[in-house]
Amino acid sequence: MNYFHYPHKIALEGGDSLPSITIAYSTYGTMNADKSNVIWVCHALTANSEAAEWWAGLIGSGKVIDTEKHFIVCANILGSCYGSTGPLSINPITEAPYYSSFPLVTIRDMVKAHILLREHLGIEKIFLLMGGSMGGYQAMEWCIMENDRIGQLFLLATSATESAWGIAIHTAQRLAIEADQSWQSASAEGGANGLKAARAIGMLTYRNYNIMVARQKDPDSDKLDHYKASSYIQYQGDKLVQRFNAMSYWLLSKSMDSHHIGRGRGGNTALILKDIIQKTLLIGINSDILCPIAEQQFLNRHLPNANLVVIDSNYGHDGFMVETSIISQHLANWMGK
């Protein structure tokens, strides 16, 4: 992992600012002489910059995103807790962690930081910009903000705006965090129980009825407690608490809520999408209840050069992370055209 420190004030879309920022990022492979082999991966909500680890089925030597052929970049987003400036970072003005005083950031603010890193790395054009879920939000915004620097787009399980359904889910998750009285305490562990509950809510939308019944149904019909499904959800909550922070989760859920490519651009999402002329591969997942295929179908109707593939998966929204074999096949076929 590498770190880029930008020592100047950065204005945020909501009117606040940060006195300086640090961006944690990872790179794989080598940039070629004419810098034409750059692939930039935008990550989702609780991921980090180590894309070759959490998307190992797609990225690596000999994989469809080949580290022997491409120069791959992934940057941790503003507001996260994996090295980039966020609630746990030290405010250079107060010399103490931001904690709950960290300002709201939008997807556009995250992309603004990505652009600063792009400039720092000397990248003039991105051959392929890709992301799933919240990563897709960043990719679309970036393509609008720097259209002439993006070659192709690969978007998975994502949408042009955050849906009312998504906002409602995020609100429920924030209510869970806010119910934990420790969540705004001056501590990295603040809100841990609330974060666990928020993750539990999220898991119900990342998966679905079919996969939960198939994987977590109890064979013992005489049980009165300690059900397999309950243990699974508890485990997922505990696992996230070990690696993430309630303040970042609360903040980034707000970032997702504000995702709307039409904001400040006239509001006509369909019209704005028509300006994204890049060759685009869209992946939708037939069992996704968080960002259903209707969202990708909308993108497909209004992006001039899009191709939509709907994959069969039992894993719902998480399919964009799990189904790397079939996704790799579709991406390889598309890139070869």
Predicted regions and their residues:
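Catalytic-loop region of hydrolases
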Residues: 1-38
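N-terminal cap/lid subdomain of alpha/beta-hydrolase-fold enzymes
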Residues: 26-92
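Cap/lid segment of the alpha/beta-hydrolase catalytic domain
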Residues: 63-116, 167, 171-182
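Conserved hydrolase catalytic core segment
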Residues: 125-164
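Alpha/beta-hydrolase-fold enzymes
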Residues: 149-151, 155-239
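Short beta-strand/loop motif that positions the catalytic acidic residue
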Residues: 276, 282-284
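Conserved alpha/beta-hydrolase "acid-adjacent" motif
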Residues: 289-295
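Catalytic active-site module of serine/aspartate enzymes centered on a nucleophile-bearing elbow/loop
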Residues: 297-298, 305-337
